[in-house]
Regions:
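Beta-propeller-forming repeat regions
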Residues: 1-156
């Protein structure tokens, strides 16, 4: 993402051929993560808009273009980290905010609607990672101001 939108860039298959550049969506896009959160076969895009700014949205492909279908409603200052994957087999976006509530939260699509849950507050996540193991999943969070790395363990 950039101040001019979100672009999909593909390198050439053969050396010397042209790169392919396609504009995916407009807007000031700071960070993105993709997953098919609603299991319709098409990946949705979670964005931080603009770079380290105060909006987190989910966009869905509708009639050939990505349209905003979800906005994180909590007041945000310095949205900083996104990751997507599956948490105990369910598609998920996980996001972190560095100021105000400094929360770590996730969004899932359950029974036809987006469900948001705050995992922790006051932690200022700078980087996130999701690891799937056989009997549990791990959410890793590098919490900036606290100078700590935290592992949240999610089991059935």
């Amino acid at each position: 993402g950039c101040d001019d939108g979100l672009y999909k860039v593909k390198p050439p298959i053969d050396l010397g051929d042209e790169w392919s550049i396609e504009k995916v969506m407009n807007g000031m896009i700071g960070e993105v993560s993709l997953i098919d959160i609603d299991n319709d076969g098409i990946k949705e895009i979670m964005t931080i808009e603009a770079f380290h700014e105060n909006k987190i949205h989910i966009h869905k492909m509708i009639d050939g273009e990505y349209r905003k279908v979800y906005t994180y409603e909590n007041e945000i200052d310095f949205a900083h980290s996104l990751v997507s994957g599956n948490l105990r087999g369910v598609p998920i976006f996980i996001a972190g905010v560095r100021r105000l509530d400094a929360e770590l939260f996730y969004v899932q699509y359950i029974d036809g609607k987006f469900v948001t849950k705050v995992i922790d507050k006051g932690v200022e996540p700078a980087n996130l990672h999701l690891i799937n193991e056989g009997n549990r999943d791990l959410i890793l969070s590098a919490n900036h101001t606290a100078n700590e790395a935290v592992v949240y363990i999610v089991e059935d």
